[in-house]
């Protein structure tokens, strides 16, 4: 009889702790389970949420890697289009000046320099501004279009005009200009080629605007995820 009245070891061990089964927990334990009106998660809930949090973080990093890859690929495509524009400019001005010498040298410079100019300019004026968040959508599209026009058409055209003009004078493939009309003479020689460059000009402006808009939307995705819905 005395043995039945004596509390068991397990009951005495969990005194002050939430009791098992249908037995109700003490009042102080109930109050301790609540903090600022919210139930404190148990150890089981924490273990359950831990893989979920890890999965969410992993998905965030995966989205970041995908967005960064798309950004790099878009910039490289934009630079490649400037390179193609430089090749076309070199071809047009070589035909205008009737130059058939040093083709590899001129094509190498007209292929690589516009790419580098486009990528560096886009990095300085668009990508850095997007990462800092100090640029609007309209400004981003405008800057990208101007970079396409300047680095994708104007710079390759001026470079091709200069290099092939020097070769034309060096090898005397065209008549030398009279005194006082040097610039007019060269412009008349290559006016057909300058008109042909209107095609890559339009293409580079559209390409730049599309690239800027695309990268703006990519950079706005993470910010939109951080803003809670009303």
UniProtKB/Swiss-Prot annotation:
One of its GO terms (cellular component) is mitochondrial membrane. As part of the MCIA complex, involved in the assembly of the mitochondrial complex I. Participates in constructing the membrane arm of complex I. Belongs to the TMEM126 family. This is Complex I assembly factor TMEM126B, mitochondrial. GO terms for biological process: mitochondrial respiratory chain complex I assembly; mitochondrion organization; response to food. Its main location: mitochondrion. It is found in: Mitochondrion membrane. It comes from Mus musculus. Part of the mitochondrial complex I assembly/MCIA complex that comprises at least the core subunits TMEM126B, NDUFAF1, ECSIT and ACAD9 and complement subunits such as COA1 and TMEM186. Associates with the intermediate 370 kDa subcomplex of incompletely assembled complex I. Interacts with TMEM70. It is a multi-pass membrane protein. Keywords: Chaperone, Membrane, Mitochondrion, Transmembrane, Transmembrane helix. InterPro entries: TMEM126 (IPR009801). It comes from the Eukaryota. It holds the Pfam family TMEM126. The chain crosses the membrane at residues 70-92, 107-126, 139-161, 196-218.
């Amino acid at each position: 009889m005395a043995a039945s009245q004596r509390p068991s070891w397990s009951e005495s061990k969990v005194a002050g702790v939430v009791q098992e089964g249908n037995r109700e927990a003490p009042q102080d334990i109930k109050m301790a389970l609540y903090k600022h009106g919210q139930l404190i998660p148990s150890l089981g809930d924490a273990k359950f949420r831990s893989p979920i949090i890890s999965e969410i973080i992993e998905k965030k990093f995966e989205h970041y890697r995908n967005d960064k890859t798309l950004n790099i690929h878009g910039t490289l495509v934009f630079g490649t289009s400037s390179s193609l524009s430089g090749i076309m400019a070199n071809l047009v001005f070589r035909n205008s000046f009737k130059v058939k010498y040093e083709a590899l040298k001129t094509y190498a410079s007209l292929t690589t320099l516009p790419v580098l100019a486009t990528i560096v300019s886009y990095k300085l004026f668009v990508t850095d501004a997007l990462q800092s968040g100090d640029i609007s959508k309209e400004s981003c599209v405008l800057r990208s279009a101007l970079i396409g026009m300047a680095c994708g058409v104007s710079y390759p055209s001026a470079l091709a005009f200069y290099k092939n003009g020097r070769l034309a004078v060096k090898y005397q493939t065209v008549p030398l200009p009279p005194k006082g009309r040097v610039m007019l003479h060269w412009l008349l020689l290559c006016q057909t080629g300058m008109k042909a460059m209107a095609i890559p000009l339009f293409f580079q402006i559209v390409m730049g605007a599309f690239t800027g808009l695309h990268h703006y939307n990519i950079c706005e995705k993470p910010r939109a995820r951080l803003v809670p819905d009303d």
